[in-house]
């Protein structure tokens, strides 16, 4: 196993697991791609571990895992990677990439107009994101 290419992705509960991996096992995993996930309310992610690259997506009309919970989990990874608040649009639309992150540890976030689900662009975008490593 190439230890520099270990990734985690998941949807809903799997997205929560990917966020947890990003917080607690960023020294093992290179990147995560949570979709419609968040962090458990009793999970103490401090956002202080080693940086981890992330591509994440969340539907704006998700009623199962509220978008604000996904944003809160994303913000822990932004903190962990020392990212700024400025973003630039990236493909696929409506994704944005945060600026000022630790070199090699980009954070891409895609809020799409949809419910609790996987966006139609999700699988291809995640594969492309992971292939850069």
Model segments located where?
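Extracellular/periplasmic catalytic domains that process cell-envelope and extracellular macromolecules
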Residues: 1, 24-27, 46-50, 99-105
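Flexible "cap/lid" loop of the alpha/beta hydrolase fold
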Residues: 38-54
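A conserved short beta-strand
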Residues: 28-38
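C-terminal catalytic histidine-bearing segment of alpha/beta-hydrolase fold enzymes
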Residues: 55-57, 68-71, 77-133
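Hydrolases whose catalytic domains are alpha/beta-hydrolase-1, hotdog thioesterase
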Residues: 17-21
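Gly/Ser-rich "nucleophile elbow"/oxyanion-hole loop immediately N-terminal to the catalytic nucleophile
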Residues: 1-13, 23-28
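Acidic beta-to-alpha connecting loop that harbors the catalytic carboxylate
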Residues: 13, 60-63, 113-115
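Short beta-strand immediately N-terminal to the catalytic nucleophile in serine-hydrolase-like folds
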Residues: 8-10, 35, 57
């Amino acid at each position: 196993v190439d230890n520099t290419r270990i990734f985690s992705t998941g949807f809903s509960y799997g997205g929560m697991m990917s966020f947890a991996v990003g917080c607690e096992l960023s020294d093992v995993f290179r990147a995560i791609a949570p979709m419609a996930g968040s962090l458990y309310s009793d999970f103490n992610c401090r956002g202080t571990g080693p940086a981890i690259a992330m591509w994440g997506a969340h539907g704006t009309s998700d009623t199962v895992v509220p978008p604000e919970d996904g944003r809160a989990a994303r913000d822990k990874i932004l903190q962990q990677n020392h990212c700024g608040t400025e973003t630039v649009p990236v493909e696929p639309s409506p994704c944005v990439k945060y600026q000022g992150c630790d070199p090699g540890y980009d954070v891409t976030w895609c809020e799409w107009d949809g419910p609790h689900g996987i966006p139609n662009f999700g699988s291809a975008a995640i594969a492309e994101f992971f292939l850069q490593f």
